[in-house]
């Protein structure tokens, strides 16, 4: 799978995957510990790119946070954002602010997300060039 190869090239080997079984779409979330540095974990959706969001490219979401945050909660949050995008066929573009219906995780005050390029990582990470369409990796 070209997406997995792309992710592992820039983020290292996938430590684990979390399937979001309570969701309507076939999505999972990949976990990359100590990326981009020690004490931080990076998460990526897998499967969002199968859905047309009414844009020239397809998407997989990237989220980076403290390794202390609960992985299952982050996976549920990311799959929820992905479901919203799929349901509304809405692309997620750089510079947008996404207002959330609640905080990301219990104990956090974060209830909105800013969409940016994945600036923590190598510039070439932000796009995976495919045969039929490109996949972009916005950082939330």
Where are these regions (language model features)?
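Acidic, proline/glycine-rich low-complexity IDRs
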Residues: 1-140
């Amino acid at each position: 799978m070209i997406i997995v190869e792309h992710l592992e090239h820039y983020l290292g080997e996938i430590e684990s995957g979390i399937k979001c079984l309570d969701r309507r779409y076939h999505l999972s979330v990949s976990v990359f510990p100590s990326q981009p540095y020690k004490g931080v974990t990076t998460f990526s959706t897998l499967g969002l790119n199968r859905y047309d969001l009414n844009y020239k490219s397809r998407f997989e979401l990237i989220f980076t946070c403290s390794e202390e945050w609960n992985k299952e909660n982050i996976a549920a949050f990311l799959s929820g954002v992905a479901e919203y995008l799929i349901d509304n066929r809405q692309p997620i573009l750089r510079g947008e602010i996404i207002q959330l219906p609640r905080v990301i995780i219990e104990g956090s005050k974060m209830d909105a997300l800013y969409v940016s390029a994945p600036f923590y990582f190598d510039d070439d990470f932000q796009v995976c060039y495919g045969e039929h369409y490109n996949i972009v990796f916005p950082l939330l």
